Amino acid sequence: MNGHFAAVGNGPTAQQYEHGIQVIDEDKAFNTNLNDYLGETRVAEAGFNYHLISVFGSQSTGKSTLLNHLFKTEFSVMSESARRQTTKGIWMSKNKRAGANGDAATMADNILVMDVEGTDGRERGEDQDFERKSALFALATSEVLIVNIWEHQIGLYQGANMGLLKTVFEVNLQLFLKDRQSQTRSLLFFVIRDHVGNTPLANLRDTLVQDLTKIWSTLSKPQGLEDSKIEDYFDFAFAALPHKILQPEKFLEEADKLSTRFTTGHRSAKDQEFVGGVFLPEYHRRIPADGLSVYAEGVWDQIVNNKDLDLPTQQELLAQFRCDEISREVFVGFDSVIVPLEEQQAEATRLGKATVLPDLGVTGAGTREKCVKAFETQASRYHKGVYSVKRGELESKIDARLKALYQTQLSAAHKSGVAAFSDAVTNAVKAGQKAGGYEFAEIVDKQKKKTLEFFKKEAQSLLIQGVAWTNFKPQYRLFEKELDEVSARLRKEEMRRLAIRVERWVKSRLGDSIGVEFNKLGSGRGGSGAPENGEKPATEKDLWDRIWNTFSGIIREAETRFADRAKSFEASPEEVEVGLWRLRRKSWVALREKIEEEMMESNILMKLRENFEDKFRYDEEGVPRIWRPTDDIEGIYTRARESTLGLIPLLARFRLAETYAPPDLPTFVGPQPAGAEPEDEEDLAPIGGVDEEEGKSLEEEMTVLSESKRQDLVVRFKKMADGVYVEAKRSAIGGITQVPLYFYIVLLIFGWNEIVMVLRNPMLFMLLLVMGGGTYVAYTLNLLGPMMQMANAASNQAVEIGKEKLRDFLENNQTMRQAIAMPPRSQDNGIGMDRLDSRGKKAQEVEEDDDI
């Protein structure tokens, strides 16, 4: 009994699949391997291009035999020696006539034939439950219901299977109540067996139609269907076959002809007989072949559990199942492409790198389209509503993954773009600095356009037509905004560098100008700060006025330079205002540092000494003083000292001579601009009188020397001045020789004769007069010391030369050299004038290296 088929519960083999499969066994168990069978027979991939036929009839009436001859199947047939049930349950096999004897051109593709267990069998007896359930199953799944009937049974009720047909009609109404919208039709194909030809086929047809109409009229119809006709739900077709035993050749011939009717047909109206094949489009249950097994299993589950069979619901459930299954299948391909990209991004994120994946947009869009199209190809055959929902879910699932991938890509492009922009601007600025000039605003504008184009290109490459979230305009605006922020930061840094350069320039100018002003302290009498061209020097009391005016002029020029250069950066007025405010503050601090440098203890003492010496050692015309005992050294010293001491209070505080008050520093610096940020104040030193909260007043800010330093400076200066005074006094007194008066009397008495002799001799008198005048001049000019040193050196040199000459004489005389055992003279013992010291002695020899 179909032992060569793949039965329920078995682990079927490919060879068993070649014959067919048991769909439902006699115990009402469904075969879950049906989908494998459809795959093995290549029906599953046919989509809607398949047809399902079921055969009904009484037991042992030759249903399986009929199918085997029509479709070349191998269903088991009853043994003629023992009339008993052969087909148990429902069996299925694929049409095998296709492709043989040229029949492939006349029969439809992928015809599946179900051999249903016969009715009215003694094995089941009164139990008609399986009969009803199998009829409902066949009607819910099949396009064509073949009713196998013998000619002599026509006109009978039980013999002609009228009871079975009534069951078919009843379950059809049951199905229709659940599916009024589609109103699926079915074909009842009556195959009249053992037709001998005495009764024309047309008469037999009329008899059957009358019987069917009568049965339909006796049915209890649902509300609203009372006037319905059988033709509203069923089409009828009729065929007759000769007796198989009595006319075997004729039977085979007619069976072959009948098989050709199982092809696609058509008709122009419902009331017209269809022409061509028996498979009309309205018969198809619109269940894709790859979902047929799931659909059939769901239908049978509802039937066997005595639940109301709701085909639309079953179709929806099938659609949900298959769409989910197809979605998982296509998502595997999606993962195979996307997961490696996600792993690359995850690795880059872990390493903290901004990695832009190449061709991500093309890959993502192509993979998405491929997956959606694959889903559409397979799933669009199912329930449209379910398909639409599941497609939306698939697209949402794909888009969620792609969105995360794309956003990470844009984030990486964002970061790398910002970094590239910053580096490009920085490098261009450095190159411009080396070249000697650059326009910061042009550099920023050029690099910004280039970077925006890069990001725009990357964002556009990720665009998917019809997908709203791939319109990355917000991300583009955010990127542009951050570039503006980076531009502002770079501009601020550039302005900081500009400020530093201007500050250096200010410090350099202040270093020269302020140093010159301090060098002018008391320099009107030929000191270190005396004017070169003899113009009248500036007064000491307006020192701070000159310093403030010089400082103000330098700052005005610096502000002009800063503002002009900042405008070329396209800096805002607020940024320029903040920069100028910082410049004024830092410039004032630089001035204070320069003043403190000039007012260091060693420097100020030197300035005071120079000031004092300028007044003490030089007269009003700048001529050096030669101190004589008759000079008023004490008076000059006192005036010079008091004048210099008067500088200390002047230098102690920064005050203008005109107002005798500090300069208006708060007005000069100005209030803090509204655009100043906390970081703009971090490197600024507090200024007294400006930053009141720092607790330092303007008076304290303008104090250069504290009271203790002033007192210490006065004491040290007085000690230094006293030393200069003592030195001057000593030089004046040191020129006087105290000779006793009696010495001149004794000299006159004892030297009278010599005096008379000199006076009487004009030549001697003139010589004495010249020598005396020369000595007086030498004494007056303090040249006696140097002259004595020169004379001493000359005498010493003469002695050395004499010794050398004597040595030469002894060395040249062989007899004398032998007598005193004198060694020969070396070649380098000569005496040169440059070998003698200031006293005429021979200087110590310094050996020289012959290699130099």
Swiss-Prot record:
Keyword Acetylation included in the entry's annotation: no
Segments in the Cytoplasmic topological domain: 1-738, 784-852
Gene3D superfamilies, A to Z: P-loop containing nucleotide triphosphate hydrolases
Residue ranges constituting the GB1/RHD3-type G domain according to the UniProt record: 47-283
Residue ranges, compositional bias (Basic and acidic residues): 834-845
A Pfam family assignment: RHD3_GTPase
UniProt keyword annotation of Glycosyltransferase present: no
One function term, GO molecular function aspect: GTPase activity
Subcellular location: Endoplasmic reticulum membrane
Ranges where the record places region Disordered: 825-852
Annotated CDD domains: GBP (cd01851)
InterPro entries on file: G_GB1_RHD3_dom, P-loop_NTPase, RHD3/Sey1, Sey1/RHD3-like_3HB
Lumenal side: 760-762
Transmembrane feature ranges: 739-759, 763-783
Membrane-topology descriptor: Multi-pass membrane protein
UniProt GO cellular component terms: endoplasmic reticulum membrane
Leading EC class: hydrolase
A biological-process GO annotation: endoplasmic reticulum membrane fusion
Coiled coil: 475-500
Residue positions binding GTP: G57, S58, Q59, S60, T61, G62, K63, S64
Keywords annotated in UniProt: Coiled coil, Endoplasmic reticulum, GTP-binding, Hydrolase, Membrane, Nucleotide-binding, Transmembrane, Transmembrane helix
EC number, UniProt record: 3.6.5.-
HAMAP family recorded: Sey1
Protein name: Protein SEY1
Organism of derivation: Chaetomium globosum (strain ATCC 6205 / CBS 148.51 / DSM 1962 / NBRC 6347 / NRRL 1970) (Soil fungus)
Gene: SEY1
